């Protein structure tokens, strides 16, 4: 019984934050940016670091440098970048919640591309309409230790 409990606890560690990934395609922002044959409406699961934020009249646009995702769907910020994308969210979005430098994971659908610039370099941004977004707490990447420990302790009051 004890072994079943321990295995259950270990298996629960690092659970994905976005559970509905049934229709997610294995496509990277670079694949879309480079003109691959990927249809609008394709569902993706991407994550990365916020580098720019813009509230427009009826939606917000968040520029994200993409990174591969860990098992818990957190962006692996120490890995090489997989390109950039623009996350589009409806209505007004609080800029403090999506501050530059924070990391996020999004499940969304591709909605075409937009030509823009990264500094002086022309760049084609994949547009993603967000369906489910998780913003990671500051410093999440430094807290990757196991959440289960075994030990004996004594509490004294």
Indicate where each model-derived feature is located:
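Sec-dependent bacterial lipoprotein signal peptides
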Residues: 1-13
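OB-fold and OB-like single-stranded nucleic-acid-recognition modules
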Residues: 13-157
């Amino acid at each position: 019984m004890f072994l079943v409990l321990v295995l259950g606890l270990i298996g629960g560690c690092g659970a994905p934050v976005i559970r509905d990934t049934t229709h997610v395609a294995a496509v990277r922002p670079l694949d879309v940016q480079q003109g691959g044959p990927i249809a609008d409406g394709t569902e993706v699961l991407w994550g990365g670091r916020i580098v720019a934020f813009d509230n427009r009249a009826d939606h917000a646009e968040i520029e994200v440098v993409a990174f591969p995702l860990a098992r818990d769907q957190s962006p692996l910020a120490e890995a090489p970048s997989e390109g950039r994308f623009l996350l589009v969210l409806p209505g007004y979005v609080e800029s403090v919640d999506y501050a530059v430098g924070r990391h996020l994971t999004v499940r969304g659908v591709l909605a075409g591309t937009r030509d823009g610039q990264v500094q002086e370099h022309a760049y084609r941004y994949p547009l993603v309409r967000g369906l489910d977004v998780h913003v990671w707490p500051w410093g999440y990447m430094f807290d990757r230790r196991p959440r289960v420990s075994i030990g004996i302790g004594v509490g004294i009051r």
